[in-house]
């Protein structure tokens, strides 16, 4: 009652009492919650040391991966450089093989020249900061025959050599292995490498494509030779009294028999071995142009397409009148040069209506020309000669429709 009496006498006491009796908010300490059974003192979170260790481990792993990536990239680049080297050596060696065929060198002499050329050009290419040599040891430089049908390189056909295989090494005592940047870390300080390339002169010509531009021509003479005469030449049954030496014709045999391309008994009067490759207007100007410059793009377009054998291995060309004395100067100007001529099996018809059945294209060298005087004294003397046939169509059926003709050197493996 005393408290109530006091309030009645002084009403301000109500606000003071209210304030004194109002509950205060509880103070909650910032500690980690504990189980009721956990009597240990509170623990605070401290993990900065673990993150540092993990970071160091990740950096180490990344450094190893980076080192592997750099070395693998270097190996890849070096392998590409080595392949470029073997390609260069094989191409150069195969062109040297062609030159050896032109010069009539023996297989042993050709092999020596090929080896020199392979090393000369191969050693010009840098591989992993050094210049590897191509050594003529073991089977690193091999002559052989490349079969375009089976795509196999055969070393058992020496008479048909048309390809060169070159191996280039960077291993051991042969040019040394390729050094690596992080070899110590990865446990391997060097990497051995080998690259093999095969270059070939394909000699199964099946015809000729139409040149892509007007500036390109085919080195074909529009004069055909009968098959029997050509076979006699190949078999060595004709005379061998002339040869081309040091830029001139000499009266000395060279192991290659000659024949007279001037028409001799083709069986078609008025068509002494001349064929139309292009326009059929019998123009002496056209023939003169073809002798000097070759068969043009327009000439083949006049024939409605490429000059190609059919499935029976035959190509039909219309006959033109005999070789005119009007092209004597043009023929004399190409003495010593090589040309392609068609070989026919038979001819049917007379005059401009004659049709020649062409069965082969062959490479020859012009040695003598005489188109004036008595008929028996006229001649257009040629001998077999290896030559490059550009725009050639390659036969892929295993049949050969050419002699002494080769495509430009190409990489086949």
Where are the regions a protein language model picked out?
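Alpha-helical assembly-interface signal, strongest on the long, hydrophobic N-terminal helix that forms
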Residues: 3-19, 27-38, 42-120
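N-linked glycosylation sequons
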Residues: 58, 102-119, 133-140, 145-167, ...
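Long, low-complexity intrinsically disordered regions enriched in Ser/Thr/Pro/Gly
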Residues: 125-126
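Divalent cation-coordinating acidic motifs and surrounding scaffolds
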Residues: 129
